[in-house]
């Protein structure tokens, strides 16, 4: 009888795979505007020490000057997405201008890198932008938690703003362009790990939540 019960249980596990406890909490850290050289390198080191993967939305004009850092992001196992080439408002661009922004940035990505997401600077949107992203096979990505680290330059305040509001499935917006942002990011990781959160890339978060990102569609969080 015990052998029969064990066999039934094993078959049940094969037929109904476990995706993880419903009590598990997942979030995605995202970093805009880079790469930035020493700040990005310090961030990569800190994330590696904590076993955390993130998603970096890179600008083409920055990649042009920091190709080695872009390669380091990719080789460390982080996800790379696009943030346009010029960091100009893509919501005000023509279809052809958006296409060029995407193509010029794609040409600078590390070999083998196949991005899933495009984050328009400022979270901009337009029909031309959506169509260009769709035709390039890119989903659009915004965010659900924004502590405005780029403006306040106060690591403790940024940390508090995120920790006090973050929920399972959130996409956190940060930057890797200054010391205070890196300090805040690593402090946030430490605090949320202590609260039982698990950090994953945006693509991983979507998969965990059963979402298949569609080209041209905008996503802010995954519940």
Describe the role of every protein-language-model region.
Residues 18-108, 114-115, 187, 207:
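Active-site beta->alpha N-cap acidic-glycine motif
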Residues 53, 79, 139, 146, ...:
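Residue-level detector of anion-binding/catalytic polar loops
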Residues 32, 47, 80-83, 118, ...:
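Conserved, mostly hydrophobic/aromatic
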Residues 31, 58-61, 82-84, 120-122, ...:
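A cross-domain feature marking catalytic cores of carbohydrate-active enzymes
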Residues 42, 88-113, 122-168, 181-184:
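Alpha-helical scaffold elements lining the catalytic groove of polysaccharide deacetylases
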Residues 5-18:
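Hydrophobic h-region of N-terminal signal peptides that target proteins for export
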Residues 21, 49-51, 64, 180-223:
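C-terminal domain-boundary segment and adjacent tail
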């Amino acid at each position: 009888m015990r052998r029969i019960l064990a066999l039934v249980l094993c078959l049940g596990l094969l037929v109904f795979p476990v995706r993880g406890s419903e009590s598990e909490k997942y979030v995605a850290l995202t970093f805009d505007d880079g790469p930035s050289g020493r700040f990005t390198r310090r961030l990569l080191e800190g994330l590696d020490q904590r076993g955390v993967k993130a998603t970096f939305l890179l600008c083409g004009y920055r990649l042009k000057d920091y190709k080695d850092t872009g390669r380091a992001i990719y080789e460390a196992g982080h996800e790379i997405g696009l943030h346009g080439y010029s960091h100009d408002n893509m919501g005000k661009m023509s279809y052809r201008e958006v296409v060029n922004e995407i193509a010029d940035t794609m040409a600078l990505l590390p070999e083998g890198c196949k991005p899933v997401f495009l984050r328009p600077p400022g979270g901009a949107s337009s029909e031309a932008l959506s169509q260009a992203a769709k035709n390039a096979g890119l989903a659009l990505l915004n965010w659900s938690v924004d502590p405005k680290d780029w403006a306040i330059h106060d690591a403790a305040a940024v940390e508090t703003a995120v920790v006090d509001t973050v929920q399972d499935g959130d996409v956190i917006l940060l930057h890797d362009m200054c010391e205070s942002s890196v300090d805040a990011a690593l402090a946030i990781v430490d605090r949320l790990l202590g609260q039982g959160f698990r950090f994953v890339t945006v693509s991983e978060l979507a998969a965990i939540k059963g979402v298949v990102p569609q080209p041209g569609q905008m996503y802010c969080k995954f519940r």
